[in-house]
């Protein structure tokens, strides 16, 4: 892979809104695109690691905003053990972690930050 457009020792992270382990309830094209992003990120992580470039994914859960349908929010929240949808601020620490030296030995990973949604509710 051509690295000419990326300086060495950089961090790249992408956002993938579902864990690759969770079956999306959307059209097949959505699933194909999301799984492709996971595969592409892992490919780049493997190819660029020796150049000091780390590539990781952040898989956030649903983010609440006041435009969301209340019935949708209630239905989704029942599947989140923490009991609420995320706020944008809930992801700041994860993004800082992925872009910092604290994750220097991490590449090709998918960091799931979803309030426990992928483990299911009790």
PLM region spans:
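Conserved SDR Rossmann-fold cofactor-binding beta-strand/turn motif
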Residues: 1, 54-64, 99, 112-114
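Catalytic loop of short-chain dehydrogenase/reductase
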Residues: 1-50, 62
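A glycine/serine/threonine-rich, flexible loop-to-helix segment
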Residues: 8-18, 50, 57-80, 90, ...
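Short C-terminal tail/terminal secondary-structure segment
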Residues: 15-18, 96, 107-122
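Short-chain dehydrogenase/reductase
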Residues: 41-42, 92-95, 99
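Conserved functional loop/turn residues at catalytic and ligand-binding sites
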Residues: 44, 52, 84, 101-102
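Short, small/polar-rich loop/turn modules that mediate ligand/substrate recognition or access, typified
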Residues: 49-54, 106-108
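A conserved structural motif in NAD(P)-dependent oxidoreductases
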Residues: 80-91, 102
């Amino acid at each position: 892979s051509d690295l000419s457009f990326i300086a060495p020792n950089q961090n790249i992270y992408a956002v993938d809104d579902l864990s690759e382990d969770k079956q999306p309830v959307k059209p097949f094209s959505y699933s194909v695109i999301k799984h492709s992003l996971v595969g592409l990120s892992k490919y780049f992580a493997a190819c660029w690691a020796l150049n000091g470039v780390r590539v990781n994914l952040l898989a956030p859960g649903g983010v609440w905003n006041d435009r969301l349908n209340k019935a949708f929010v209630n239905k989704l929240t029942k599947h989140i053990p923490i009991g609420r949808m995320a706020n944008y601020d809930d992801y700041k620490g994860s993004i800082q972690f992925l872009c910092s030296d604290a994750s220097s030995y991490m590449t090709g990973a998918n960091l799931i930050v979803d309030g426990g949604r992928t483990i299911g509710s009790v």
